[in-house]
C-alpha cells in the first residue's frame, strides 16, 4: 500500500465514526399509541370478538327449596360464552331473580300441604340469539308456576350488549336525544291495524325497553296482559329500519341497502 493510499484510508476512519455516532444519536420515533396501548388493544379485541356460546345447567346443591309457604322446584340454565363478563352478568341476574335457589337453608314441607297444593315451578333459561358486529343479543326466558294456579306466567327479556363498551344497551342508549315521541308515533303507524283491533290509541301506546334487532326492523316486545290477552302471548311491534334510521344513532343502526327513489 502506498503512502498516499494509507493517508486517505486513515482520514476516512474519523468520518465514518462520526456518521455512525450521529446515526445512533438520532431520536427514534415514538411507538404508535393506537395499537399497543391496553385501551386500544381491548377495543380491538372487543370489535373482533365472535361470540360463541352454549347453554349449561347451573349446578345447585338442591333443585328444590322448601319453606313455610311450600316447595319450589328450580330449573336454571345459563349461557357459557367466550366472554367472561357476559357470563358473569347473566349468572348474577339469575341469582338476584331466585336467591332461594342458591341458599343452603331448607325446610321440610308438610306432607299434607305438598299433596294438596303440589310443587311450585321456577324456570330460567339464557340463550344467545344473534350478533351484528359489536352488538350481541341474548334472551332470558323465565317461567313461574304457582301450585294450584290455572296457568303459569312466562316472560322473554332480550338483552343487547355493546361489546366495545362492555355494557347492556337500554332504549335510551340507542335513540337520538328527544326522539321518544317520534319513535312512538312511527311505531304506532307501522302497526296501526293490529293496535286499532285491540283498541289501543296512539296516546296509550308506550315504548317498551324490551327490544331486539330483527331482520327488517327494531322489534319492541311487551309483557303478557299489557296490550293483549294472555292467549296472544307477548306481543311484538316492529319499527322498520327505514323508519328507524332518523331516530336511532348511526353507531347502533345496522348497515342498510341504498334504495332507489321511485
Residue ranges of predicted features:
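Bacterial N-terminal signal peptides that target proteins for export
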Residues: 2-13
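Repetitive helical segments and hydrophobic/amphipathic motifs
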Residues: 16-17
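C-terminal motif of bacterial Sec signal peptides marking the signal peptidase cleavage site
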Residues: 21-24
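Compositionally biased intrinsically disordered regions enriched in Thr/Gly
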Residues: 26-262
